[in-house]
Amino acid sequence: MEKKPYEIKIIQKKAKYHPDPTIVFNHICGSQKQTLLLETAEINKKNDLESIMIIDAALRISSERNHSVQLTALSKNGENILSILKSNLKQKVQMFIQDTSIRLEFPHFQKNLDEDKKIFSLSIFDTFRFIMKFFKNRNKVQKAMFFGGLFSYDLISNFELLPKLKKTQKCPHFCFYLAETLLIVDHQKKTCLIQNSLFTKNSHEQMRVEKRGREIQKKLEASLNSIPVRQEVKNSMLTANMSDEQYCSIIKKLQILIRKGEIFQVVPSRKFFLPCSNPLSAYQKLKKSNPSPYMFFMQDKDFTLFGASPESSLKYDDTTRQVELYPIAGTRPRGRNMDGTLNLDLDSRIELEMRTNHKELAEHLMLVDLARNDLARICEPGSRYVSDLVRVDKYPHVMHLVSRVVGTLKPELDALHAYAACMNMGTLTGAPKIRAMELIAEYEMEQRGSYGGAIGYFTDLGNLDTCITIRSAYVEDNIATIQSGSGIVYNSIPEDEVKEGINKAKRVINAIQHAHHLV
């Protein structure tokens, strides 16, 4: 018999506001693992909007292999969640119990299920639903249960039958932290809030968590230290997993399949490697040189992931039940004079050329259509529409063609159903999506890991906000992997697509090089 949901206790404290969240993160978290910084900014003005930090996590929830989830308690607070799961899930999934962790094994998906049955099949995403089911947020406090982290590109193999690929990194299929201590910074109001979530009635644990909140409050009253500059790395050579010629050859082979009508579009990618012993400093450089709507720094026990992404993945607002996709396809450099200043006339001519380029428009409209199809599967009939079509977003160094597709999520579905139905985003795969992903697997021959997945958060109130993991670096054993791709259509020029892929990676590469004094 299942117990009644346990009520979450929320402890909130106001704290001193600081404008630079990267320095705050360094000051509070340092090299502490299972920490996360998420930032949002306005597209046009590039003003910071909100920063959210997971300073302490109660649980680390990860899927290291298909249909398997590992839940590890990081505090007594988290251990209570595991004890509740242990006594309530035995009949639902296979469970393997250790001292401070649980492994859940889920059934493999059945082949040839229709879409409706498939979306409701038991899956690794039900791990989060189980946790949320056993806890009650009576006062509807925002972010009371806050799951922040990463969906990898390869997560799709839990939901679709795709070729098995070589795993070259420790990056899990997903990795999320359930926040115990959050720092919520509103840059418009210049406020800072410490929020602790208690998932246990243990008085000693409550005292510990309250003390932790006071410690952070006190730390924020002190002057903040700048991010330390580390010594230069010895081997600074940039390498790649394939040459320009090899990448160009793959593009040409995929174009043959496009001409045969097997696919309409595909997004092959390649990896660049660079030593990176100071990821937070590199992230700070990237933020300054390339401010973006979504910026993130994730510090896990196995890896560090940071980036500045221009592209929303999937966004869902439970209040309105609106689900949103934001395809970006079409990129040009900003028009600048020789001295680096903006040339408004040149900039407008570059924008006009991009807006009227047949190849760019064909690629972009295919992806808008793909987004419409993705939402049609999960939205109420007649609610899906294109709210913005072929708009231009401008950043310091590049401009993009963007559109926005929205709809009303069916009442029986939640944000995780929506993400499962829409991943991976068409701008990182192609169309038709499944065949494009099969071809990507065939030609790239190894897992993508974080690249092309999504990073962000979802909450017990049902909201979800994620961005596509691009313009990013995945750092493992002090080596950064920077991955970039190009959208290939019938009339793409392979040599131009090679250059576009390099240009996309350059901003992150330059940030790492500047942080380590390599340039």
Curated annotation (Swiss-Prot):
Pathway the protein takes part in: Amino-acid biosynthesis; L-tryptophan biosynthesis; L-tryptophan from chorismate: step 1/5
EC numbers for this chain: 4.1.3.27
Positions annotated to bind L-tryptophan: T40, P293, Y294, M295
GO molecular-function terms, A-Z: anthranilate synthase activity; metal ion binding
Binding site for chorismate: G330, T331, Y451, R471, G485, S486, G487
Top-rank taxon: Bacteria
Cofactor(s) needed by this chain: Mg(2+)
Cofactor: record remark: Binds 1 Mg(2+) ion per subunit.
Reported regulation of activity: Feedback inhibited by tryptophan.
Catalytic activity: chorismate + L-glutamine = anthranilate + pyruvate + L-glutamate + H(+)
Family matches, as InterPro entries: ADC_synthase (IPR005801), Anth_synth_I-like (IPR019999), Anth_synth_I_N (IPR006805), Anth_synth_I_TrpE (IPR005257), Chorismate_C (IPR015890)
Residue numbers binding Mg(2+): E363, E500
Example GO biological process: L-tryptophan biosynthetic process
Keywords attached to this entry: Amino-acid biosynthesis, Aromatic amino acid biosynthesis, Lyase, Magnesium, Metal-binding, Plasmid, Tryptophan biosynthesis
NCBIfam families per record: PRK13564.1, trpE_proteo
General function of this protein: Part of a heterotetrameric complex that catalyzes the two-step biosynthesis of anthranilate, an intermediate in the biosynthesis of L-tryptophan. In the first step, the glutamine-binding beta subunit (TrpG) of anthranilate synthase (AS) provides the glutamine amidotransferase activity which generates ammonia as a substrate that, along with chorismate, is used in the second step, catalyzed by the large alpha subunit of AS (TrpE) to produce anthranilate. In the absence of TrpG, TrpE can synthesize anthranilate directly from chorismate and high concentrations of ammonia.
Record text on subunit structure and interactions: Heterotetramer consisting of two non-identical subunits: a beta subunit (TrpG) and a large alpha subunit (TrpE).
Family (UniProt): Belongs to the anthranilate synthase component I family.
Name of the protein in question: Anthranilate synthase component 1
Top-level taxonomy: Bacteria, Pseudomonadati, Pseudomonadota, Gammaproteobacteria, Enterobacterales
UniProt gene name: trpE
